[in-house]
Amino acid sequence: MIDSDTEDRCSHDSSHTGTEGGNSTQARGETGEKALLPPPLFKHRDLTRIPKSAPRIEKRKLTNIINHLNFTDGYLWVHLRDPRYEEDIFVHAYPQPCTGEAITCRWSQENLTGFEYHRFLNLVIDDGMAVTLIPVKLLHINREGFTIQMPDAGHVLGKREARRYACQGVTAELTQSGFLARGTLLDFSSLSFRVRVAPALEGSFHWLNPDEPATLTLYQGQKIVFSDPCRFIDQTSSMSVKEIVLAPQKTKFHRFRGREIRSPRVNLAPSSSVTFVHPLVGKDIQRDIIDISVSGLSVLENMDECVLIPGMIIHHLTIRYSGALKLSCTAQVVYRRKEKKGGFRCGLAILDMDASTYGKLSNILGNVLDPHLHISDEIDTEALWKFFFETDFINSKKYALLESHKDKFKELYRNLYRNSPELSTHVTYQRNGNIYGHVSMMRAYHRAWMVHHLAAKPMPGNTSHTGLKVLHQLLNYFDGFTHLPSAKMDYAMFYFRPENRFPNFFFGGFVRDMHNPEICSLDLFAYKNYGVKSSQNPLPDKWSLKEFSAADSYSLEQFYRNHSKGLLLRALDLGSKPSGDSELKEVYKKHGFKRQWKMFSLTHAQELKAVLIVDQSDIGLNLSELLNGIKIIVTDPHGLPWDILTSAIDQLTSVYEVDSIPLLVYPHTYLENSNVSYEKQYYMWIIDIQYAAKFLDYMKKKTTIKLRYALKFFFKRFLKK
C-alpha cells in the first residue's frame, strides 16, 4: 500500500505518499471479526503531480503489469476525491484481465461502498520498489467495480532504497523493559519492519519510549524467525492499536564465538545455490552462493531484490550443488554488507544440519581443498583392513582378540562406515583407492564423542606429513559439527598413551597451555587386561555392590574434584542426575549395533569406595576395546583391597562374551600401590565443546607450522600402542 508509516521514512524517499489511519487492509477488529473500514485519508496531494522527468511506462507494459496483478491475485489503489469535502482518499481494487483497451477493477469487499459520486484521479500500483501512477478516464462504475480507458502511458514517481514486501501470518511481539505488545507484521524491507500491535493486558503505550530501542520478535507458527533490538522510525498516534516502523540496530553479529583462524571458505564449481521459502513472505527464494565453509556461506543480493535481514532465521534452507545434490539445514543471516561492484553480500551461519548431510557437505568442501581427502563417504573396507594391518594399528595382540569374531567384525565396519552417520564419521587420505591416513569419531556417551583410530603412513611422492593433513581436516570437520544441536556433542574425548609423542604434543600440549581443567582435562588411567571368570566370590560382610544412585554422587564428585577438577564425570554423565544410556542404546540398536553402559557403586558400611562403569559394545567397535570393558574410579584407594575389588568385578563380567576385558583404573597409582601388575597407561583427554574454538585455533596453528623434524621425530611413534 501507500502510507506514511513505511521504511521510506528511514530512506527519505521523495516519491513517498501517505495516508492517515494506517493500512486499509486492516479488516479485523480486536474481536477478530471482519469489518468494513472507511477509506484512508490521503494527505500528500502534491506527491501525485507528475514531474516532467518521471519515467514513462508504455501501454503494452502497463497491460502486462495489470495482468500480472490479476494472475497473482494482487491489488492496486484507487485515488479518489470526496466531492463534499474535497478530501482525497485511497481504496483497494482488484484488476480483472486486461486486453489493452480498458482496465476493469472490482472493489475490495473490505471497503465501504458508495464511490459512484467520487471523482476518479489515478490508479496507483505499488510494487514494493516503485510507485506507478496511471491517469484515469472513467468509462463505467457501479457498486461492484469500475472500468477506465487504458491511457497511452503511466509514470513512475520514484524508487525506494529497498523493496518492501507485504506479509501474512507472521506474529509480532514488541518488548521494552517489561512492556509487551502483540500483533502482526504488515510488511518489511531489508531496512525495516512495519508492525501493527496492541499492548498486552494491563499494559499501555504510555510505557513505550520511542527514544529507546525495543526488541522485536517475529514468529512463523511456533518458530522464532527474528528476534533483535530495533530503533523506532515512525508510529501512528493511536493509543489502542499502533502501526510502528522499526529498523534493526545490527547489520552484523557473531552467532558463534570468535575465531582467530576460520575454516577455509571455498568457491564451488560447478556453481551452487541456496533455495528456501522466505519465512516472512512465504515465497520461494533462490540465491547463488559466493563462497561456503562447513559453518556458513555467503550470497549476493541485487539492490532491488533484497530479502535477507541480519538476525533472520531460515528453518528450511536447501543448498543445491551441481544441480543434483540437495543439502538441507537451518541457517541464520549474520551480516549484510554493501559491495563496491553493486548489490549486497549476505552471510548465513549454519545453525543445524543432520549428521549425514553435514558429512556430505564436509566431503565436498574437503575434496575442493585436497582431492585426496575423503570425509564420511563410502569406503573400500578391504583397503581399510590392509591399512590397519600395515600401520600396525591391528597388531598381533589385537588380532588375537578379533580373530574368532572376524566375520562379524568385517560386517560391523561395513555397516558403521556406510550407514551410520548419526553415530560415526571418518576422514581418510587416499590415492587410487589406497588409504594413507585415517581418523574416525564416534558418539560414545550421551553427549560425548570419542576420537579414535588415528593412524597414517607416508604417501609415495608426497613429502608432507599425512597424519597432520588428516588431523587438520578433522579439525575443519569439528569447526561446524560442534555447533549443531542434532550432533548431541557437549564433549569430545580421546585416549592416548603418555609415550605417544604425536598426540601428547598436540592434545596434551593444549591442556598444558590452557592450564584450566574445566576447559580441557587429562586423566591418567592404568590399563589391565582382566580374565573373565566363571565363578564368583561373594563380598565380605558390610560390603555391597549396587547400581549407582544420586546418593553416591556427592562422594564421587568430592573425590574427583580434589584429585583432578577435570571433565571426566560430566563427559561420562556421572553427575547427580545421570541420564543413562537408553536414548543412545536405541540409536545404536536402530543401526544394528550394541552400545550400553551401567554404573555401580561399591560401598563398605554405606561409604563409597569405588564406582564401576560397565561399558558394552560390539567387539571391535573400538579396536582397543575401550568401550567394551570396565572403567573403575577408586574413591578410597587406601580403603579398598584389591581382592575385594576383584570380587566386585567378577560379579559384573557375566555380560561379556569374551575371555578377557580391559580394565581402566583411576587413579592410575591404585594398581601399583596395591602391588598389582598392569600392561600400560592411557590418558583420557576431554574438552568442553563450548571452548572448541580455542582448541581449533591452537591446533591449526600447530598443524600449519612446518616442523622440520616432525616426520623424523614424531612419525616413528605416531601411534605406538
PLM features: residue spans?
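Conserved active-site beta-strand-loop modules that form the wall/rim of enzyme catalytic pockets
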Residues: 181-184, 193, 286-287, 297, ...
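Structured alpha-helical
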Residues: 1-438, 476-493, 499-534, 642-644, ...
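Flexible, substrate/cofactor-facing loop regions flanked by secondary structure
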Residues: 397-408, 542-602
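Glycine-rich acyl-CoA binding loop
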Residues: 451, 460-479, 641-646
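Conserved donor-binding loop and adjoining core beta-sheet/short helix segment
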Residues: 417-464, 602-640
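C-terminal intrinsically disordered extensions
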Residues: 523-558, 697
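Extended hydrophobic-aromatic, low-complexity segments
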Residues: 205, 309, 526, 568, ...
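Bilobed periplasmic-binding protein-like "clamshell/Venus-flytrap" ligand-binding domains
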Residues: 656-663
